[in-house]
C-alpha cells in the first residue's frame, strides 16, 4: 500500500494514472465523483480573439492559479447542444480539474445554422495560436481535438504549417474522411466499413447539416425553402409540394428522405450541382 501511494504521489506515470481515473469517473455516470476532493473549482471564462474575418469567441476552463499548464483546443463542430449544455460544461470542468486548460472554440454558423463552414479551419489555427500565447498555458504542451465534423476540421488545422510543429497532440473523436461516403451512408440508412454493412439511422442533426449543404447549392429558391422546411425544421411536405420540385430539387429531396440502396444514393449524389462537389 505504501509503495502504491509513493508511485501515485511521486512518479509521472502514477500521477497520470491517478488523474485519468478521476477524470473518467467524473465524465461517466458513476456514483462517486472524486475530482472535486482534490482540486479547486475551475474558472470558466468567455474570451475573444482575432480571426481573419472578425473576432472569435471561446470558453476557457482552467484551475484558478497562475501555473502554466498543458492545454487543449476543442471544436465541437455543428454542435446543437450549445455552450451551456451540461455535457459540454462537465467535459470542460473535468479536463481542467485534471490539470488541462480547455478552450472550446465556437462557430456561430455551424452551431446555430447547422452549416459546414470551412472558414472555421483557418479560425482554429488562429485560436490555437491565441491559446498557446496565454500566460496560464505551457506553450510546449498544447494540443487540438474535436468531435464529428469538428474533429475533421481539427485534423486539417493541426497540419497547417503555421502551427503543426507546435501541436503536441491531436484527439479526433468520430471524424469523417470523405463527404461523399457520409452522404451516401446517410441517404441509404446504412453504414459500411470494408465488407461489413449494417443498418444505420442517422441523427436528425446529421440530416439537418447535410440538408443545409445541399439546399444552398440549389438554384431554385422554392426548392431550397421546401427542403429546409422538411429536413431542417422537421415539417411534412404534401404530394403537391413534392411534385412541384425541380429536377435538382427532387434529387436533393430523395437523397435526404431515403433511397433504396447505396448504388442509387451514389447515382443521385453525382447528379447534384457541381457547386456541391466543389
What would you call each of these model-derived segments?
Residues 19-70:
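N-terminal cap/lid segment of alpha/beta-hydrolase-fold proteins
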Residues 69, 75-81:
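Active-site glycine-rich loops that stabilize anionic/oxyanionic intermediates
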Residues 74-77, 104-106:
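Structural cue for short, hydrophobic secondary-structure segments
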Residues 86-103:
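Short amphipathic alpha-helix adjacent to the substrate-entry channel of hydrolases
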Residues 115-136:
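Alpha/beta-hydrolase active-site loop
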Residues 135-148:
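Alpha/beta-hydrolase fold nucleophile elbow
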Residues 146-156:
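Glycine-rich nucleophile elbow surrounding the catalytic serine of serine-hydrolase chemistry
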Residues 156-258:
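Alpha/beta-hydrolase-fold enzymes
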Amino acid at each position: 500500500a505504501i509503495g502504491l501511494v509513493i508511485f501515485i504521489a511521486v512518479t509521472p506515470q502514477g500521477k497520470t494514472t491517478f488523474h485519468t481515473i478521476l477524470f473518467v469517473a467524473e465524465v461517466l455516470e458513476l456514483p462517486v465523483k472524486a475530482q472535486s476532493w482534490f482540486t479547486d473549482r475551475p474558472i470558466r471564462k468567455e474570451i475573444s480573439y482575432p480571426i481573419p474575418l472578425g473576432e472569435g469567441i471561446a470558453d476557457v476552463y482552467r484551475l484558478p492559479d497562475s501555473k502554466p499548464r498543458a492545454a487543449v483546443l476543442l471544436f465541437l463542430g455543428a454542435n446543437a447542444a450549445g455552450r451551456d449544455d451540461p455535457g459540454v460544461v462537465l467535459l470542460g470542468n473535468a479536463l481542467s480539474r485534471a490539470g488541462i486548460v480547455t478552450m472550446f472554440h465556437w462557430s456561430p454558423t455551424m452551431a446555430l445554422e447547422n452549416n459546414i463552414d470551412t472558414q472555421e479551419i483557418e479560425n482554429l489555427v488562429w485560436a490555437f495560436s491565441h491559446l498557446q500565447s496565454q500566460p496560464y498555458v505551457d506553450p510546449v504542451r498544447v494540443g487540438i481535438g474535436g468531435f464529428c465534423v469538428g474533429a475533421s476540421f481539427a485534423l486539417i488545422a493541426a497540419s497547417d504549417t503555421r502551427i503543426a510543429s507546435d501541436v503536441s497532440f491531436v484527439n479526433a473523436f468520430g471524424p469523417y474522411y470523405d463527404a461523399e461516403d457520409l452522404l451516401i451512408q446517410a441517404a441509404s440508412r446504412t453504414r459500411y466499413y470494408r465488407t461489413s454493412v449494417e443498418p444505420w439511422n442517422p441523427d436528425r442533426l446529421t440530416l439537418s447539416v447535410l440538408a443545409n449543404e445541399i439546399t444552398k447549392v440549389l438554384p431554385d429558391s422554392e426548392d431550397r425553402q421546401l427542403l429546409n422546411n422538411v429536413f431542417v425544421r422537421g415539417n411534412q411536405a404534401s404530394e403537391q409540394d413534392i411534385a412541384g420540385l425541380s429536377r435538382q430539387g427532387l434529387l436533393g429531396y430523395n437523397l435526404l428522405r431515403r433511397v433504396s440502396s447505396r448504388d442509387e444514393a451514389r447515382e443521385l449524389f453525382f447528379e447534384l450541382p457541381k457547386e456541391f462537389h466543389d
